[in-house]
UniProtKB/Swiss-Prot annotation:
<feature type="compositionally biased region" description="Basic and acidic residues">
    <location>
        <begin position="20"/>
        <end position="34"/>
    </location>
</feature>
<keyword id="KW-0690">Ribosome biogenesis</keyword>
<dbReference type="InterPro" id="IPR034353">
    <property type="entry name" value="ABT1/ESF2_RRM"/>
</dbReference>
<feature type="region of interest" description="Disordered">
    <location>
        <begin position="293"/>
        <end position="320"/>
    </location>
</feature>
<keyword id="KW-0694">RNA-binding</keyword>
<feature type="compositionally biased region" description="Acidic residues">
    <location>
        <begin position="84"/>
        <end position="94"/>
    </location>
</feature>
<feature type="region of interest" description="Disordered">
    <location>
        <begin position="1"/>
        <end position="145"/>
    </location>
</feature>
<dbReference type="InterPro" id="IPR012677">
    <property type="entry name" value="Nucleotide-bd_a/b_plait_sf"/>
</dbReference>
<dbReference type="GO" id="GO:0000472">
    <property type="term" value="P:endonucleolytic cleavage to generate mature 5'-end of SSU-rRNA from (SSU-rRNA, 5.8S rRNA, LSU-rRNA)"/>
</dbReference>
<dbReference type="GO" id="GO:0003723">
    <property type="term" value="F:RNA binding"/>
</dbReference>
<dbReference type="GO" id="GO:0034462">
    <property type="term" value="P:small-subunit processome assembly"/>
</dbReference>
<keyword id="KW-0698">rRNA processing</keyword>
<protein>
    <recommendedName>
        <fullName>Pre-rRNA-processing protein esf2</fullName>
    </recommendedName>
</protein>
<dbReference type="InterPro" id="IPR039119">
    <property type="entry name" value="ABT1/Esf2"/>
</dbReference>
<dbReference type="InterPro" id="IPR035979">
    <property type="entry name" value="RBD_domain_sf"/>
</dbReference>
<dbReference type="GO" id="GO:0000447">
    <property type="term" value="P:endonucleolytic cleavage in ITS1 to separate SSU-rRNA from 5.8S rRNA and LSU-rRNA from tricistronic rRNA transcript (SSU-rRNA, 5.8S rRNA, LSU-rRNA)"/>
</dbReference>
<dbReference type="GO" id="GO:0000480">
    <property type="term" value="P:endonucleolytic cleavage in 5'-ETS of tricistronic rRNA transcript (SSU-rRNA, 5.8S rRNA, LSU-rRNA)"/>
</dbReference>
Length: 361
């Protein structure tokens, strides 16, 4: 609605209007009506223009405020379609701005250690992918040199155990010791058996040191010396008998031990098979002898029954047959070559024997 800025009733009456009060004039009335209509039209048009200008000013002020926030001026001669597109773009820009603000807030809240840990990952993502270097295939590495040394102990104190030997050598400063091997002593058949004593004694042994130098020094210093220690010790007066084995390794010792063990097992196997065969032959002979004895007994019983019923001649024949049956095996004796039976001059041989004996005694 347009508002009237001018009040007609408060206007000063002109001279023409003053004359109209006196009498009615049709022409003057028509002219006055036309003037009023013109005035009304001009007022309405002016009001409309003022309203449009105020609306345009408001829209321009809003656009200017938006452009100040965004930093992008807009022209006044844009169509409604462009304004809609601009609104959509403004909303998208606002969304991006919000995302950027959120990202900045998130990075601000992170601790410096976390940011450092995440920085290489982000840089790796943004940076270009680097080419992987081709690693050469693992070549066959040469085996490490075996710098160990081995000493041989030809005799050991009685009932000395491997860990006791190792501790004795290490307490004297000869170490580190990597391996110890002692061969158990095999009791002889003539020696008396001791069932009560369960402790083992060892005949000889080998000790491997981590370095050759310590093995040489140990063999040179301790060889042909007493074990020592406390005076009341069990091994105080025993003597060390050791030698450094030059160019000898633990693998060689194991090969030798395995070879001896395999030979021992093979000999034992052969002896076992031989003993089994002998036992089998003996059992077969015993069984055959029992069978023959049973047959002989049955035959004798039959002959006795026949002899009782028959004549005396029959009994004599049965006795002769029984004597023949008893002689089952005959061993043929081999004659000795050049025996006394075939020597012609026994007296000459006796003379020669006497002469030799007289020279000796």
């Amino acid at each position: 609605m347009t508002t009237r800025k001018r009040n007609e009733f408060l206007d000063v009456v002109s001279d023409d209007d003053e004359g109209s009060d006196r009498a009615y004039d049709s022409e003057a009335a028509e002219e006055s009506k036309g003037r009023l209509a013109k005035r009304r039209k001009t007022h309405t048009r002016a009001d409309d223009l003022s309203d449009e200008e105020s609306d345009i000013g408001r829209s321009e002020s809003e656009d200017e405020s938006k452009t100040r926030l965004k930093g992008k001026p807009k022209s006044k001669s844009q169509t409604t379609e462009r304004s809609n597109d601009d609104d959509d773009e403004d909303e998208a820009d606002d969304g991006e701005k919000m995302q950027v603000d959120q990202y900045l807030d998130a990075t601000a809240t992170l601790s410096p250690s976390q940011s450092r840990s995440q920085s290489p990952s982000t840089s790796s993502v943004t940076s270009k992918p680097t080419k992987l270097k081709k690693k050469p295939l693992d070549k066959v590495r040469p085996p490490k040199k075996n710098k160990t040394g081995v000493i041989y102990l030809s005799s050991l104190p009685p009932y000395l155990k491997p860990f006791a030997l190792k501790s004795m050598l290490e307490t004297r400063g000869f170490g580190p010791i990597t391996k110890v091997f002692l061969t158990p002593e095999v009791p002889s058949n003539s020696a008396p058996r001791r069932r009560s004593n369960k402790r083992k004694s060892y005949a000889d042994g080998w000790v491997e040191f981590a370095s050759k130098k310590t093995a040489k020094i140990c063999a040179e210093t301790l060889n042909a010396t007493i074990v020592g220690g406390k005076k009341g010790g069990w091994y105080h007066d025993d003597v060390w008998n050791m030698k450094y084995l030059k160019g000898f390794k633990w693998a060689d010792l194991m090969e030798q031990v395995q070879r001896e063990r395999s030979e021992r097992e093979a000999k034992r196997r052969i002896e076992d098979t031989r003993a089994r065969k002998e036992d089998k032959v003996f059992l077969q002979g015993v069984e055959q002898g029992k069978v023959l004895q049973g047959i002989q007994k049955k035959n004798e019983e039959k002959k006795k029954k026949k002899g009782e019923t028959g004549t005396g001649e029959g009994s004599a024949d049965a006795a002769a047959n029984a004597s023949e049956l008893k002689v089952r095996r005959l061993f043929k004796q081999n004659e000795v070559k050049m025996g006394r039976d075939k020597v012609k001059d026994i007296s000459a041989l006796e003379d020669d024997a006497k002469r030799v004996l007289s020279k000796i005694f």
